[in-house]
Amino acid sequence: MGRLDGKVIVLSAGAQGIGKAAAIAFAKEGAKVIATDINGEKLKELESYKGIETRVLDVTKKDQIEKLSKEIDRIDVLFNVAGFVHHGSILDCEEADWDFTMNVNVRSMYLMIKTFLPKMLAQKSGNIINMSSVASSIKGVVNRCVYSTSKAAVIGLTKSVAADFIEQGIRCNCICPGTVDTPSLRERIEARPDPEQALKDFLARQKTGRMCTAEEVAHLCVYLASDEAAYVTGNAHIIDGGWSL
């Protein structure tokens, strides 16, 4: 018996990193997983796993989200993972950077939740998990201005949805990781003027001496997706190795 037997889970950003690790972990626990991503080629890597279906999806496109919703009869868990990390202070953030980050990190979750929540309400049960960060209202982080602003908004969105629909059987939580060793992080490191120093800087701020793995975050995802967390809603779950202390 798996911890997620019979559950239908839809998630975004499933092609790599936390989204991919979570999709695999969900499937191993018996869930039917519909993993989406804008990168169709990378997404194909998940098709070899039992219990995982894939769909190409741009989470900033309302019409694509609505089309996906019509293809799915039931949804037990919605996991919003897609996000973008902008590097810089407010002075480095142009209006286009601000708009793009907010569109990907916040508006996409608004669109996904607003589209799939009615199905959950009709079922009188549902579970929403949003990806936030400790770089948010939890902790001020250098050169993460618009990113942190967007992730603070995700915490607010999470708590609002949880409060509004708790009596209708809906749970909503968010996950707030610290620095997670993912392909996205490695790409950002390589894009810095001195990648070797950038990596050292990331490691230096980790009180545990290492970065979190995507698989460790996926363990928390499984818990929140399962009935073990049936009494848990409206919370920002920190998994940062003590970085925010």
Curated annotation (Swiss-Prot):
Query: To which pathway does this protein belong?
Result: Amino-acid metabolism; Siderophore biosynthesis
Q: What is its main location?
A: cytoplasm
| Binding site residues for substrate | R144, R188, R205
Is Magnesium among the key words of this record?
A: no
What Gene Ontology molecular function terms does this protein carry? 3-hydroxybutyrate dehydrogenase activity; 4-oxoproline reductase activity; oxidoreductase activity, acting on the CH-CH group of donors, NAD or NADP as acceptor
The keyword NAD is assigned to this record: yes
Task: Cite the EC number.
Answer: 1.1.1.-, 1.1.1.30, 1.1.1.104
* Cited function: NAD(H)-dependent dehydrogenase/reductase with a preference for cyclic substrates. Catalyzes stereoselective conversion of 4-oxo-L-proline to cis-4-hydroxy-L-proline, likely a detoxification mechanism for ketoprolines. Mediates the formation of 2,5-dihydroxybenzoate (2,5-DHBA), a siderophore that chelates free cytoplasmic iron, thereby regulating iron transport and homeostasis while protecting cells against free radical-induced oxidative stress.
Name it. Answer: Dehydrogenase/reductase SDR family member 6
Q: Which gene encodes it?
A: bdh2
